[in-house]
Amino acid sequence: MLIKKITKIIGTSILIILFISIYNSVYFDIPKNEIISKHAKGASDFLELADGSKIHFRDEGNKDGKVLLLVHGFNGSLFNYEPLVPYLSDNYRMISLDLPAHGLTGAVESDLYSHKAYQNVIEEVVKILEVDKFYFVGHSMGGMIAWRYALDNMDQLNGLIIIGSAFFG
């Protein structure tokens, strides 16, 4: 009698654990439009690139000020730079973007996610926004992208600001 009761309790416990494990392993995808409507606030906008990709960006601050192009690090987004806006927006035009596969940009049409592909996206964004010269601010992976961009486009840069980044990769 006691053995049947213990077996029943153990069996029920195993079924409950199995159910919870299966439920937690299922990925419930949130529709992209729902995420965008929730998080694309304020100065958020989207640029369409030549290949049809849509890049999430913000263009804020003093439109007549010197331009800061802000690029986030790995697993980051343009929201990483939000705390700087109140301190810099009076004097600078601040352009930030979500790199492909990050933030609200998400997947891109080209399916290219290398550092060179990120650099090409930045070149296209800068061209679309008609920015001639700017200070490139890059954090972590964004710093490496900024450094590589600088090597190929020194004539476009007023300066390079790299935060917590390795220069290899």
Residue ranges and their predicted role:
Residues S53, E60-L104:
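Conserved HGGG/HGGXW glycine-rich cap/lid loop of the alpha/beta-hydrolase fold
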Residues L2-K66, D132:
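Alpha/beta-hydrolase fold catalytic core
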Residues Y23, L70-F74, V137:
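Short hydrophobic segments within beta-strands
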Residues I128-G169:
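Conserved hydrolase catalytic core segment
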Residues K32, S44-D45, P86, E123, ...:
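Solvent-exposed, non-membrane alpha-helical residues enriched in polar/charged side chains
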Residues E82, E123, W147-L151:
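Short, hydrophobic alpha-helix immediately C-terminal to the catalytic nucleophile
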Residues A50, R58, S96-V137:
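Active-site loop/oxyanion-hole signature of alpha/beta-hydrolase fold enzymes
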